[in-house]
Amino acid sequence: ITMKIGVMSDTHGSLPYFEKALDLLKDCDVLFHIGDVLYHGPRNDLPEGYNPKGVIKEINNLDNIIIVRGNCDADVDQMVIKHPIEDGYILTEVGNVTFLLNHGYLESKEETIRQAKDKGANVLILGHTHVKELYMDEDLVVLNPGSTSIPKDGSHSVAIIEIMPIEGNHHEVDMDINLIDIN
């Protein structure tokens, strides 16, 4: 069975872009939100359709989402969001692939990549920069889905990861990762 993971980050309280992202990711088995969920933070302009309460409602309607704490996420957010907002590094496995999720602001990227390799991750997913990235560092896939609502590289974006079992092989999988613009 093919597993689909939807990845978004840095929604910063924009309801229209959160809804557009959800629409693109509606067929996914699980969602990863890589942080900066509700607030725009002191360095960003207000995103289009800024409506943290609306985003809370949408998030609380979702069943299968993992949320990483970003630098703009406050303690109070956990009182209104029913899913855990996890600090630091989250190691999780989906379809035989090990993911390390981290917002990407606490340590240097080099250190975060080293952590991912030390923890045996196949894929490291970061946010924070609002810039899309997808590349290999030795055997590690490094992905940043960019920002859903306040991109710094011109286009609002999400990512979809597809994990397909290989016939007759219980350990290896094929993986496709696509960055998708949501303009």
Regions found by a protein language model. Give the residues of each.
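Active-site environment of divalent metal-dependent phosphoester hydrolases
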Residues: 12-19, 39-41, 72-78, 106-111, ...
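Binuclear metal-dependent phosphoesterase catalytic core
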Residues: 95, 114, 119, 136-138, ...
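Hydrophobic/aromatic beta-strand patches that form the interior of the parallel beta-sheet core
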Residues: 32, 66-68, 125, 141-143, ...
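Internal catalytic-core helix/loop-beta-alpha segment
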Residues: 82-131
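Short linear motifs in intrinsically disordered
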Residues: 79-84, 122-124, 150, 167-169
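Core catalytic region of metal-dependent phosphoesterases/phosphodiesterases
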Residues: 4-94
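Active-site-proximal beta-strand elements of phosphoester/diester hydrolases
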Residues: 4-12, 97-105, 141-146, 179
